[in-house]
Amino acid sequence: MKSTEKLKWNKFDATWMLNLFGTAVGAGVLFLPINAGMGGFWPLVLMAIIVGPMTYFAHRGLAYFVLSSKNPGSDITEVVEEHFGKTAGKLITLLYFFAIFPILLIYGNGITNTVDSFIVNQLGMASPNRVILSFVLIAVLISVMLFNEKVMLKITEWLVYPLVLILFVLSIYLIPEWNSAVLYEFPTVGGFLTTLWLTIPVLVFSFNHSPAISSFTCSQFREYKTFDGAERHISHTEKGASTILLFFVMFFVFSCVLTLTPEELVAAKEQNISILSFLANKFDNPYISYFGPLVAFLAITSSFFGHYMGAREGLEGLYLKMKGEAVNRKKLNYATALFFLLTLWGVAIINPSILGLIESLGGPIIAMILFIMPMYAIRKIPAMKRYSGRFSNVFVTIMGLIAISAVVYGLL
């Protein structure tokens, strides 16, 4: 196939596109209109223009980094060691694991809280035993990951279709309620730039699907057998994932922001409730609030699978680096599954409040791995030189540094 020939969508690429979408869209999508829209409408417009290319180029760069190994099919933990040496490889793998693992803990906790809340508030039943409920939910999620890749991708596909449909229908449903108040609120230049700076990380992490990129890249190579074939299909699939993320998520965000006044967005933030709960109260329409737990359930479950892949790679990569010898991968898979089951179950029972802080500490690490590491590799690693000289490299580096500086500022 000539490199200039336009790729057609096939079932394999489309399924992975939906998986990457599912990995990115977690329960945070229900708070995104509040967090992203509080700074006003016009900064949001500029961010919507920036975030699409930012998502595509950054994730494509990370995928090309994984693909650049001289040993085809190597995952990210093996590639960092190959390119940066054993010590740096161990350190990056450790950071990679500890950036993703807290998100997995939050999802184990979040799915328990979501189902428990639905049983109590929507079904009007008594709260089930948390120990049993959390074990069943987490065990089911992890058991899916023990099946082969095709089963996991198929289940993710079933979850993402209704998720996309609900977000789209809600966005359309709100159109008659749009008001023009936010269009006439013009921030000062300083206020505009500050809002842009502080809100970029909100969108970056809402569109982040880097935990699934390594598994996605390895899967693409297994499917297409050659470097050129995998490279083209990676770019094609990633472009599709970034496009549907931009359209469906940002349409939902804009529809919510245009429905509420700036004061109402601030009130929603102060009440610390999801956008759907706030809209249900505003319009006195309980049916909207019914979608909240459903969207949260679909988003957490589909995102869980992508983050599990990343956390598993990190943990198994650490073990293999420490062990330094060949091991039975199937046994290792079951051992890591047991580790995740016990840790996620324990955290879901305790329901600690410190998880959010731990997750926020992982933010700069994820941004470094996603934005800076592949761009650094393009300059320093011979296998990545083929990607040098592109304007997109400068764009990703600058946006990555802006995102990291804003995340670090937010932690201070």
UniProtKB/Swiss-Prot annotation:
Keyword field: Amino-acid transport, Cell inner membrane, Cell membrane, Membrane, Symport, Transmembrane, Transmembrane helix, Transport
Membrane-protein topology: Multi-pass membrane protein
Any one GO BP annotation for this protein: amino acid transport
Cell location: Cell inner membrane
Leader peptide range in chain numbering: none
GO-annotated cellular components: plasma membrane
InterPro entries xref list: Amino_acid_transport_2, Hydroxy_aa_transpt
Matches recorded under Pfam families: Trp_Tyr_perm
Transmembrane segments: 31-51, 91-111, 131-151, 155-175, 186-206, 240-260, 286-306, 338-358, 361-381, 391-411
Catalysis performed (reactions): L-serine(in) + H(+)(in) = L-serine(out) + H(+)(out)
Major localization class: membrane
Family: Belongs to the amino acid/polyamine transporter 2 family. SdaC/TdcC subfamily.
Function text: Mediates the import of L-serine into the cell. Is energized by proton cotransport.
PANTHER family documented for this protein: SERINE TRANSPORTER (PTHR35334), SERINE TRANSPORTER SDAC (PTHR35334:SF2)
Official protein name in the record: Serine transporter SdaC
Gene name as annotated: sdaC
